[in-house]
Regions:
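RNA-binding basic/glycine-rich loop and surface signature characteristic of RAMP-family CRISPR effectors
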Residues: 1-168
Length: 168
């Protein structure tokens, strides 16, 4: 609740929600991806029911996920620096133990995390400037690995940048 907030719903009661200090946007691919759909069938008898489904996967993709922490809301909710460090570790390692048939172990990895810290609660610049300071450019027309991209970041005066690598 301290990080992501909470909407309280109770029948017949009005309870105010808790605004989340942490905002995580959906990840977006740098280049178009090729989606592969695979049919799955069940070999066991199923009382005449259809037992076929599909799973979808992506052949290769480099995705950028953006997020931010609102300092004023964080202070109000009691979000601490230690909580932020746990969030950073969670972002670096979230796919490590989350495998499935469409996401086999090791098929998704976080390669790099850019973590900015502004001095003070108001910050030096809006999040859009921070987000646009990192640019991922494909080096080939059809990238097939992380090495097929050039990733650069522009310095933002007054904002501390830490880069965390997951070299696998």
């Amino acid at each position: 609740v301290r990080a992501f907030g909470q909407v309280f719903s109770s029948r017949g009661m009005h309870a105010p929600g808790v605004k989340g200090a942490v905002s995580i946007q959906p990840a977006v691919s740098v280049c178009p991806v090729k989606v592969i759909s695979t049919g799955i069938t069940c070999c066991l008898p199923n009382n005449g029911k259809i037992s076929m489904g599909f799973k979808s996967s992506v052949e290769h993709g480099l995705y950028i996920l953006r997020g931010s922490i609102i300092p004023g809301v964080a202070a109000k909710n009691g979000l601490t620096c230690a909580d932020c460090e746990l969030l950073r570790e969670a972002l670096l390692h979230f796919p490590d133990n989350d495998c499935s048939s469409s996401r086999p172990a090791g098929s998704i990895e976080v390669r790099r995390l850019y973590w900015w810290e502004h001095p003070g609660k108001l910050g030096v610049c809006p999040p859009a400037i921070v987000f646009s300071s990192v640019i991922a450019e494909p080096l080939r027309s059809r990238p097939a690995s992380f090495a097929d991209y050039e990733i650069t970041n522009a310095e933002i005066p007054g904002v501390k940048l830490s880069i965390f690598e997951n070299d696998t």
